[in-house]
């Protein structure tokens, strides 16, 4: 099925197993989050186990799916995988997992196969094999597959409008289009920006969008980032930036952009086991810069990124409320997350 079919299905019922794949990684990620939340809402006691390609263990996954929920907690297993070059995975593993779900239980399975642009032939072979196992499963329409394509501009804008409506965000179609264009038509970045704009709790203006999306990635900001990772006095560098006329909001935006890029590197490395800067950034930076991105990305674990992004969220909210020089409050906490 395609995205429209998946949306319709999820309004009617929940599957036991779902396979998400295709050419657009953002939708794979989005529907993993969405379906996981639906499972959690339907069964608040369900426990989620997340596996990347790097920590994939067939026996552990099968055990989680085979356990009888009558005598223990139910499991939601989420596989975020890219097997273009992953030797531990065998397509027949999927058959084992689906058979485990044939037993009466509340266990559930979500598989997200992220697009392997470096090996499209292998990706197609793997995704086709998984689809066949799902189609042959006795679970029938409780085991579903959804393929995602790169959306056209109008489809992306419609998706963003639906998100804005969900957030009760007062933003015109013209400004929504402006946000999308400012973000180089990156649906994932634009989607996240809507959440940030929602904290304003007021009609959105072009100035709000420009302030949110401006790039503060200059050399002085790089000094601050370097200070955070090298355990130098980040507060002294921050104080210097303020005295040089840099706005607190600009510093925050620059840090958000940098750590977002780091997280993309982190997720890509965890998923593929490879460091491909062009895949992540859309261009190939000098080797030294790419290696520095990869090194810094692995300094944090997923929980660390969540804590950093939560700090950025609080910083942004308090900045919107008129508080000044919030870096003095938050930079030390970020540095401790990087250097525990």
Curated annotation (Swiss-Prot):
Note the InterPro entries from the entry: DNA_polIII_delta, P-loop_NTPase
Keywords carried by this UniProt record:
DNA replication, DNA-directed DNA polymerase, Nucleotidyltransferase, Transferase
One annotated GO molecular function is: DNA binding
Keyword Nucleotidyltransferase tagged? yes
UniProt superkingdom: Bacteria
UniProt keyword Coiled coil, yes or no: no
Biological process, per Gene Ontology: DNA-templated DNA replication
An example GO CC term for this entry is: DNA polymerase III complex
Disulfide cross-links: none
| NCBIfam families xref list | holA, PRK08487.1-2
Function of the protein: Could be the functional equivalent of DNA polymerase III delta subunit (HolA).
What does the subunit comment say?
Answer: Seems to interact with H.pylori HolB.
Q: What is this protein called?
A: Protein HP_1247
Organism encoding this protein: Helicobacter pylori (strain ATCC 700392 / 26695) (Campylobacter pylori)
